[in-house]
Amino acid sequence: MNMNQVAEYVETDPTGRYGRFAEILGRGAMKTVYKAIDEKLGIEVAWSQVKLKEVLRSSVDLQRLYSEVHLLSTLNHKSIIRFYTSWIDVHNHTLNFITELFTSGTLRQYKNKYLRIDIRAIKSWARQILEGLVYLHEHDPPVIHRDLKCDNIFVNGHLGQVKIGDLGLARMLRDCHSAHSIIGTPEFMAPELYEENYNELIDVYSFGMCFLEMITSEFPYSECNHPAQIYKKVVGGKLPGAFYRVGDIEAQRFIGKCLVSASKRVSAKELLQDPFLASDESWMVYTSGAGNPKPFLNENEMDTLKLEDDELRTEMSIAGKLGAEDNKIDLEVQIAYDNGLANNVFFPFDIMNDTSIDVAKEMVKELEIIDWEPVEIAKMIDGAISSLVSDWKYEEDDETPHDHHRHRTDSFHSSSSHASSSQASLSNYMARGLQDWVQDDLHDETYSQSSSHSGSYSNLNYIAVDEYSSQSPVMSRTHNMTRFCPEESSHLQSGQANAYAASSSTNRSLASDNRTLTRNRSLVDVQRQLLHRSPGEEARKRRLFKTVGDVETVGFQSPYAVSRKPPSSRR
């Protein structure tokens, strides 16, 4: 049916609430199941229709069947298919009843579709079926299903849920404790049923045959070619050949308890307590009635979470320009995603002290890059530097990291002492300022709108920080900075300081443990930030990009209330 085509009803129930379509969901010997709609609730339902002239011979039988199906509609259990209503169409000689619709068909269809089902899942199904049988057998009056088989057990595969259905042939035991009519499927019929003197234990026998089929994926007595052969074996106490092909001894013992003679057969309630069915719910994601699983909120698993469904492959390019200081190169990494988003990351490179391979490894770690190898990134860094420094050479020599990528003349003098002094001075500028602007500026219009977490690595546009005068108050340092996310100075211009202090007073407790916000929210794009700074401030800012630290927790706040280890620092 075309999705835009209006579905036409073939017929409706007497109230007009349920409308039946021509689409057939299943067909049995006496019943056809159609798809229907409940107009009141707006849900799809199953419309079962029984041709009465094929199963009934008198008006007494007709009234009895209608009464029993009507009573069955009052049953309410999680392992019993839900009945909504039933009625007899006198003109068409049909019995109709509405039940809930199942998404995965019958248990036989489901098991034949998925052959490699774990025994623990099969045990879960068995427990659900037995719970339904216990409910039926302890009902007042007791209810015998009389036709329990995998074709009459229905599955919601996305929930791991099974329910007993097709109760139209069930029989209620009223004043007596046994029934006397022969009805059912020969392969699943207990020996005493042929003798026309039986009770609810015939359902336990049928359950044993169902479990045998679930374990072996074989229809019971498939070796027989005629119902008469099946009858002869059943009344003679001969078990189906599939029983002897069960590899699990405990499973075979469990099935055998169901298939013994009625005098030795246990009830469904006793069978439910068998050690073989002992529940081990620790392995399951869903169990019947257990609801949703608890989230795995621990540090190791949180690190593996992806905030978007699809991994985006990235394109990367690196360009550079001479820095304001000797021996410094300002590098820009451009990262472009397939969805059109892009990121620019700016960082300094000290040609006398840094090596491209070390910086590349740092990039992979700090920016969580998974689709580029450090060696590939190092080559791009070398290419950018060699375009500015003619005698820069690249060597793949991991054994000599201090000489790696540093082959040039003395046109640049060493700045190691300057870097050291800058690092020492940075220890005097503290993280409270960083925490304040992280908290206050989350919704500033200057935040970059061009980045979104790809599931591969953090694509934050990091803020470049200013260096302020020596008159700023000295504060204790709480975490290190990296070349990709430098630490914000705590000394602010007078107009900004008050705003930051106000934010800090309300958010300090949160900022002290969670200095970050969700990864897929970008920080301020550095180039847009530069538009608001004077050339002097820009020059001072560049001198702060000198150290390598840990950026793991900068710019990220855990979406769950879980404990996190303090970020490790590195140089």
Curated annotation (Swiss-Prot):
Residue(s) carrying Phosphoserine: 522
Catalytic residues as annotated in Swiss-Prot or TrEMBL: 166
GO CC term (a single one): cytoplasm
Record's keyword terms, sorted: ATP-binding, Kinase, Nucleotide-binding, Phosphoprotein, Serine/threonine-protein kinase, Transferase
Molecular function as annotated in GO: ATP binding; protein kinase activity; protein serine kinase activity; protein serine/threonine kinase activity
Signal peptide interval: none
One GO BP annotation of this record: protein phosphorylation
Stretches with biased composition (Low complexity): 412-425
SMART domains referenced in this protein's UniProt entry, alphabetically: S_TKc (SM00220)
Catalysed conversion reaction: L-seryl-[protein] + ATP = O-phospho-L-seryl-[protein] + ADP + H(+); L-threonyl-[protein] + ATP = O-phospho-L-threonyl-[protein] + ADP + H(+)
Protein residues bound to ATP: 99-102, 149
Domain of life, per lineage: Eukaryota
Region annotated Disordered, chain positions: 396-425
Xref: InterPro entries: Kinase-like_dom_sf, Prot_kinase_dom, Ser/Thr_kinase_AS, WNK_Ser-Thr_kinase
Induction annotation: Expressed with a circadian rhythm showing a peak before dawn.
Enzyme Commission (EC) number: 2.7.11.1
Function description: May regulate flowering time by modulating the photoperiod pathway.
Name the UniProt record assigns to this protein: Probable serine/threonine-protein kinase WNK4
The encoding gene: WNK4
